[in-house]
């Protein structure tokens, strides 16, 4: 009796472990697929975020690499191709292999317009997906966060932010 209970518990633990590993692999796969969507469409990026650097992909596309989880990633607006995919199709649900509606929230980005000579943080409608927020496209949640992460220390001083 004890052995059968032990085996049943072990089977449940094994099933949960396998599900967790598959979900992790699946989430990484979804993030990689969405990342590939960005690279394939090669959107223009200013890469103004703190601690970010321009990197060149194999196809020649220049993208902005920022620390994982940093709101600096979102100093550029989300590329339209990714924004549209998440707004229209929703957030990938890796555990059910489906899509859930994206929550529409306000996020901030740095808009630099060389024609009108303006440079400021502006809000936009952002498709929030909890599973993608940290790993793929985290964006500043407030104007203050945008100013902190999207302007250098010198720019912040000139603007009177600090």
Curated annotation (Swiss-Prot):
It is found in: Secreted. One of its GO terms (cellular component) is extracellular space. Keywords: Secreted, Signal. Its main location: secreted. Disruption phenotype: Mutants display an increased body growth rate during larval development and male tail morphological defects characterized by thickening of the male rays, with rays 5 and 6 the most severely affected in most cases. RNAi-mediated knockdown results in increased body length. Secreted protein that is involved in larval elongation, early adult growth and male tail development. This is Protein lon-8.
């Amino acid at each position: 009796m004890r052995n059968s209970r032990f085996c049943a518990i072990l089977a449940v633990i094994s099933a949960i472990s396998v599900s967790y590993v598959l979900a992790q692999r699946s989430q990484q796969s979804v993030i990689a697929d969405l990342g590939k969507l960005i690279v394939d469409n090669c959107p223009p990026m200013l890469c103004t975020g703190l601690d970010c650097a321009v990197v060149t992909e194999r196809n020649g596309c220049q993208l902005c690499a920022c620390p994982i989880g940093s709101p600096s990633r979102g100093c550029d607006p989300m590329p339209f191709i990714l924004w549209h995919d998440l707004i229209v199709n929703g957030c990938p649900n890796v555990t059910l292999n489906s899509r859930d509606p994206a929550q529409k929230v306000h996020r901030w980005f740095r808009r630099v317009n060389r024609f009108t000579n303006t440079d400021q943080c502006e809000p936009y409608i952002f498709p929030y997906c909890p599973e993608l927020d940290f790993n793929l496209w985290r964006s500043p949640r407030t104007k203050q966060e945008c100013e902190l992460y999207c302007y250098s220390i010198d720019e912040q001083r000139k603007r009177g932010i600090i």
